[in-house]
């Protein structure tokens, strides 16, 4: 997967390539899809959600420019695969999932695989996780129509926010925001297609740990 799907498509960061080679993607897909786990395409994981294709996971991880001591926020835990990749590189990963059942399953899988530097919370990803801000990087794995202001506010200086932006009926663009001492720099890159970032059932949510 690393050589054929990632290096050939321009992924160069060694930490990202090593993480992608180490994390067992088959543990993050439903059992009937295990044989398809290492194909470069998204797969359904239930509740209308998907696990992103490996190239997209690698691209977002590389674009975030994560350093070994970094604190990272992920919005859209899904099955936990992106969080596991981030946890191989960063010191701390905080991840928020709107679907409680997915959050519980992701936490269970991450625990079974020994990831002790990941904290999972079920809640509204639009609000981020302000109690642990600022974050050196924020990775959003579902598409909002506009970038939520709370996520921008929770980004550390020199931090990077990686997010697909757009509606389900128009082109979405992978977008990179960088916070500099002088303000925010926004860069739109290639077209993508992600499930929408939802914010249903607003209420107080508690961490699972």
Predicted feature locations:
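Conserved nucleotide-cofactor-binding alpha/beta core module
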Residues: 65-185
